[in-house]
A protein has these predicted regions:
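Conserved HGGG/HGGXW glycine-rich cap/lid loop of the alpha/beta-hydrolase fold
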Residues: 12-61
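Active-site loop/oxyanion-hole signature of alpha/beta-hydrolase fold enzymes
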Residues: 53-98, 130, 272
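Hydrolases whose catalytic domains are alpha/beta-hydrolase-1, hotdog thioesterase
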Residues: 102-106
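Flexible "cap/lid" loop of the alpha/beta hydrolase fold
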Residues: 108, 115-149
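Conserved alpha/beta-hydrolase catalytic His-Asp/Glu region
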Residues: 119, 128, 151-219
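Short beta-strand/loop motif that positions the catalytic acidic residue
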Residues: 220, 226-228
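Conserved alpha/beta-hydrolase "acid-adjacent" motif
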Residues: 233-239
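Catalytic active-site module of serine/aspartate enzymes centered on a nucleophile-bearing elbow/loop
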Residues: 250-279
């Protein structure tokens, strides 16, 4: 895959990979992982699309300098600018977890108008369900804003998120899940800048339900696919059903025997649904 860089007007950078030719299809990974979340489906999709795989800010090789605000509004601005630059004015977009929230926020703000949108398991308008480990990691990152604690806590965060976590994210114990998590945190230990920036983001990201998104769904006047996992405890099917009821042009597909790492648990199914929906 080709590695490229996008530079936002405020200097923030997005590192992204491209594979294939055809209409651009951007796939936005979940919080805490990287573009590698989509590796199992890239080969299949690249026969039909120019697959665009960014590392979102604070992830991978993308922006992590603490000079930026890292508010939801800032994330949506950078994301919208990137998609406009890399994929054009009406991109095909797939988004998972927190990236799905950012995509809907960008649409509500009028800065993103996708031709088609695929929303994969996410809390969306509901209060996020976090495991004890995730709550611990969030507390560690919030504390990194204290001067002198950033480098120490970056090591603590890397130790708290072990590769074995990948086993809990995949219901099929998919090969590669541990490597995915290992790659996602390999640059965290000792990275004081990233720790401080994560602390900003953790402090400024809403911790409760985001009910304002309920007003955005009826305004999404383009085709939307809710591609859901049947065994992701943090993102039950009821979330997708609530969204479906409010969409003017929505459809729901549920993949059996899939968990949080939906593209690892059923890469064939995910690729099939994306091709069928995005054309």
């Amino acid at each position: 895959m080709k590695l490229r860089l996008y530079h936002h007007p405020d200097g923030a950078r997005i590192a992204y990979r491209e594979a294939g030719t055809g209409p651009p299809l951007a796939l936005l990974h979940s919080r805490g992982l990287s573009h590698r979340e989509w590796e199992p489906i890239v080969d299949e999709l690249s026969h039909r699309f120019r697959v665009v795989l960014p590392d979102l800010p604070l992830h991978g090789a993308s922006e992590d300098r603490p000079r930026h605000p890292y508010t939801p509004e800032w994330f949506t601005s950078v994301l919208s600018g990137f998609l406009q630059d890399a994929c054009g004015p009406r991109p095909l977009v797939g988004a998972h977890d927190a990236a799905a929230v950012l995509a809907v926020r960008a649409i509500a703000a009028g800065s993103l108008k996708p031709a088609r949108l695929v929303l994969m398991p996410s809390a969306l308008h509901r209060r996020p369900e976090r495991s004890p480990l995730e709550r611990c990691g969030r507390a560690i990152m919030r504390a990194a804003v204290v001067p002198g604690c950033d480098r120490l806590l970056s090591h603590a965060g890397a130790l708290a998120i072990r590769p074995q976590r990948g086993d809990r994210l995949s219901v099929t114990h998919a090969p590669g899940a541990r490597d995915l998590v290992r790659h996602a945190v390999q640059d965290l230990g000792g990275n004081a800048n990233r720790a401080r920036s994560w602390a900003k983001a953790a402090k400024r990201w809403p911790s409760g339900a985001q009910h304002d998104l309920l007003d955005a769904y009826p305004q999404m006047d383009f085709p939307v696919l809710l591609l859901w996992a049947d065994s992701d405890a943090a993102h039950p099917l009821a979330i997708a059903e609530e969204v479906l009821d409010l969409l003017p042009d929505g459809q729901l597909r549920v993949l059996p025997r899939t968990g949080f790492l939906i593209a690892y648990d059923d890469p064939i199914g995910v690729a099939r649904e994306l091709v069928a929906f995005c054309g």
